[in-house]
From Swiss-Prot:
Domain text: BRCT domain 1 is required to prevent abnormal chromosome condensation. It binds directly to the SWI-SNF chromatin remodeling complex. BRCT domains 2 and 3 recognize phosphoserine/phosphothreonine marks on proteins with high selectivity, and mediate interaction with phosphorylated CDC27. They also mediate the dual recognition of phosphoserine and phosphotyrosine in the C-terminal tail of histone H2AX.
Functional note: Implicated in chromosome condensation and DNA damage induced cellular responses. May play a role in neurogenesis and regulation of the size of the cerebral cortex.
Gene: MCPH1
Lineage: Eukaryota, Metazoa, Chordata, Craniata, Vertebrata
Name the UniProt record assigns to this protein: Microcephalin
UniProt keyword annotations, A-Z: Cytoplasm, Cytoskeleton, Phosphoprotein, Repeat
Length: 842
């Protein structure tokens, strides 16, 4: 440490860099302390010296007002080197901003990092006060609790202790605790209020309790937590003759000319409180679901013969009551068809507090016989359920989920299991608004590769290119195949039907296959021989359209927009859609439906795509025979995009853009705008593909001259900014630098009018030139400029009549030795300048 030569000095240091971004006060503070001076962190009354450089104006004014000595940093340095207290008047401080107007306040921002000290109650008073306040509040809350109020506390080991202040016995249970215990003992459904308790009906003692809960909520329709179960309902339940076990759902109506004791195995669709069309009740089928299948062989026969055939109780008893697993292809019957008359299915709007519902349906089987629950892990695509009628009308007023029977197992345990967490959370959602006329589109999670392949294997693209129509394939089984004559008479199962454009007033339907989550609709067809319906949705079916069903014939026609390529179309492989029997003209079949396919699937998936499922009902060709054409045409449309993907991210734009005389900040802006608006690729130098040259400043650079010679647009930087503002590339003419470069618009017009590759004619009449190796710009660029303007360049000087640039060899009297500026000025002005002004000294 140096001698205390400045022991009587109390200094305040304010030393900044000239631009106000760096604070150097710490360095001089250390030097002053070493010399024995005291350094104050604030400008107080004890301060005797102010070391000032480019500091605040307020500090300068305060020092002048108090008469404190203002010295520069040179005074500190001189004292240190001399080892003595130097006179302050020799090194006065200077204030460069003293005479500047005070209206402009210069903001200072020190870029140096500060020392970070972690705040603790010990070193931070504010933090200490906050900490003490929180501790007092916590203590007050603990002492304010009454001793007789039971509370819940979590112990250190994670266990839950109930009311530690009072020993709990059976008499101190809360009302909710008693309610939970009662429901567990009685195996009742959980509900927070007594008004929603399930009232079991015991009118028919012969009915066995065969239940399996099914609650597919709005949220779980698109999740992996969906579960399904075997569904059992009696004919009496459907007719409203006996009450269901669950009062939340009521089934009523009448079916004429049938027996009241006939049992029907059916699905009950519970959707939102919405009036659907008379023909369909749609269900989101895009989610993989786990189905619980417990139907017997007899029930399968009932379900497959539900239309046009009456099964008596005697026949049912003869079929046997042995329970067996419902095979995968019989997972859920997508059709509930009525024979004659009217069938009404009503459902109350689902309240947010209803957790799980159980319904017991009568079925003639031993009373103690129970259904076994079994969860299937296989993911599948749920078809949209449809309620088809042959001679009557069908109404479906439903809530947001499929509902089935509760199983004999404990609903209490099911409710609190982790598997049902999503299901319980989704039930708190508010009811959806009324559906529009076209089917609702549900958001779904992104599909895996296996699911996308499964969807395409079972998709029918036959309706693409047609106007809105409905194709109903109901109860199409392997054992019982109904003929079109039965369909027309209303006794058989509904076959392929098509509503022509004259009959259907519904809005167009967009079939989409999308990889990411979003509004989407997907077609689905069951595997061959499954005996189930396949629906291409249309929101409505005309009321008068009972038995007059038109055969549907058609295959894929246009999928060119499916992969986003408008120009890709294989006319040889695409198949035309035949007209319906109503006599529609081909011109009426405009391609209004689009299958939006994700083109990022692997080539293996595309090769494995079978065709869609379509064909004439009368001829009944096999599905694979009918759909080879649609499959091939779809593959051909996808192949070009697949090749693009293999070769890279697509073909780069053929136009290039060159920047010149532009700082890096503007260059970054241009690059970002080009990335956003597309259409250009950035090049460093002007080349054959360059069409635009952007100049940050109107300077004559090589790129500008090359751009003029090639007939490019020479534009200002503002063109990019205005294009970004408009969201697209705008007209270039208002931003052309024609004032600074008159030749630019002239060469550009000549380039546009030229039939072949453009080459200027500026130097076409000039003799052969030789460009000196010592010329500037470089020889190669200068030769290129001369060539582009129609001139001829020789490699040796003896063949040339004009020598461009400094030449050190033997000079001839017949040869003109001109400066490089002659070429540059001639190109800029688009005329051959007088050579006398550019002669080099001999």
């Amino acid at each position: 440490m140096a001698a205390p030569i400045l022991k009587d000095v109390v200094a305040y240091v304010e030393v900044w860099s000239s631009n106000g971004t760096e604070n150097y006060s710490k360095t001089f503070t250390t030097q002053l302390v070493d010399m024995g001076a005291k350094v104050s962190k604030t400008f107080n009354k004890q301060v005797t010296h102010v070391i000032f450089k480019d500091g605040y104006q307020s500090t300068w004014d305060k020092a002048r007002k108090r008469g404190v000595k203002l010295v520069s940093v040179l005074w500190v340095e001189k004292c240190r080197t001399a080892g003595a207290h130097i006179d302050e008047s020799l090194f006065p401080a200077a204030n460069t901003n003293e005479h500047l107007p005070s209206l402009i306040k210069k903001k200072r921002k020190c870029m140096q990092p500060k020392d970070f000290n972690f705040k603790t109650p010990e070193n931070d008073k504010r933090f200490q006060k906050k900490f003490e306040k929180m501790a007092k509040e916590l203590q007050r809350q603990k002492t304010s609790l009454d001793d007789d109020v039971p509370i819940l506390l979590f112990e250190s080991n994670g266990s839950l202790t109930y009311s530690p202040t009072i020993k709990i016995n059976s008499s101190h249970h809360s009302a909710m605790e008693k309610r939970l215990q009662e429901m567990k003992e009685k195996r009742e459904n959980l509900s927070p209020t007594s008004s929603q308790m399930i009232q079991q009906s015991h009118d028919n003692p012969s009915n066995s309790l065969c239940e399996a809960p099914l609650n597919i909520s709005h949220d779980t329709l698109c999740s992996d937590e969906s579960i399904a179960g075997g569904l059992h309902s009696s004919f009496d339940d459907l007719c409203g003759n006996s009450e269901c076990g669950n009062q939340e759902r009521k089934l009523g109506g009448s079916i004429n000319d049938t027996k009241s004791d006939m049992c029907i195995s059916s699905l009950v669709l519970k959707t939102n409180n919405t009036h659907l069309s008379p023909s369909f009740a749609h269900l989101d089928k895009s989610s993989p679901q786990k189905f619980l299948s417990n139907l017997s062989k007899e029930e399968i026969n009932l379900q497959r013969n539900i239309v046009g055939k009456i099964v008596t109780p005697d026949q049912k008893q003869a079929a046997g009551m042995s329970q067996e697993t419902f095979e995968e292809k019989y997972r859920l019957s997508p059709t509930l068809s009525s024979t004659k008359g009217h069938l009404l299915i009503h459902s109350r709007p689902r309240s947010s507090s209803v957790k799980r519902k159980r319904v017991s349906y009568g079925f003639h089987s031993p009373p103690k016989e129970k259904c076994k629950r079994k969860r299937s892990i296989r993911r599948s695509i749920m078809p949209r359920l449809q309620l088809c009628r042959s001679e009557g009308s069908l109404q479906c007023m439903a809530g947001p989920a499929l509902e089935a029977l509760g199983c004999g197992e404990s609903s209490y345990d099911d409710y609190f299991s982790p598997d049902n967490l999503k299901e319980r959370n989704s039930e708190n959602l508010p009811p959806k608004s009324q559906l529009p006329s076209n089917p609702a589109q549900f958001s779904c999670r992104s599909l895996s590769k296996k699911e996308r392949t499964s969807i395409f294997e079972m998709s029918d693209f036959s309706c693409v290119g047609k106007k809105p129509r409905t194709v109903d394939i109901t109860s199409f089984t392997a054992k019982t195949i109904c003929s079109p004559q039965k369909t027309a008479s209303g006794e058989g199962c509904a076959t392929f039907s098509c509503v022509t454009s004259e009959e259907s007033s519904a809005p167009e339907e967009t079939l989409r296959y999308c990889r990411q989550a979003g509004p989407q609709q997907k077609e689905d067809a069951w595997p061959e021989g499954n005996g189930f319906s396949y629906t291409i949705e249309d929101p409505s079916l005309p009321k008068g359209h009972d038995g007059d069903l038109t055969p549907f014939e058609g295959i894929l026609e246009e999928v060119k927009e499916a992969v986003g390529l408008k120009s890709t179309q294989d006319k040889g492989t695409t198949s035309k859609i035949s007209n319906s029997s109503e006599g529609e003209a081909p011109s009426e079949h405009e391609p209004r439906s689009v299958v939006d396919c994700n083109v990022e699937r692997s080539a293996e998936e595309k090769e494995n795509l079978p065709g869609g499922y379509s064909g004439s009902v009368k001829n009944r060709p096999t599905r694979r025979d009918v759909l080879d054409g649609s499959c091939d045409s779809f593959k051909d449309l996808i192949k070009p995009h697949e090749e693009l993907k293999k070769s890279g991210k697509g073909k780069k734009p053929t136009r290039t853009l060159v920047m010149t005389s532009m700082p890096s900040e503007k260059q970054n802006v241009v690059i970002q705008v080009v990335d956003k608006l597309k259409g250009f690729s950035i090049a460093r130098d002007v080349c054959e593909t360059t069409t635009h040259v952007l100049s940050g400043k109107p300077l004559r650079t090589l790129n500008v001259l090359l751009g003029i010679a090639r007939g490019c647009w020479v534009l200002s930087y503002d063109w990019v900014l205005w294009s970004l503002e408009s969201g697209q590339w705008i007209s270039e003419e208002p931003f052309e630098l024609s004032n600074h470069f008159p030749a630019a618009p002239l060469c550009r017009r000549e380039c546009h009018l030229s039939a072949g590759p453009y080459r200027g004619t500026l130097f076409a009449d000039q003799p052969v030139m030789f460009v000196s190796p010592a010329s500037s710009p470089p020889v190669a660029k200068l030769c290129e400029l001369v060539h582009l303007c129609g001139g001829r360049v020789s490699q040796v000087p003896r063949q040339a009549s004009i020598v461009i640039g400094p030449y050190s060899g033997k000079k001839k009297a017949t040869v003109k030795y001109l400066s490089e500026k002659w070429v540059l000025d001639s190109i800029t002005q688009h005329k051959v300048c007088a050579s006398e002004n550019y002669l080099l000294p001999q």
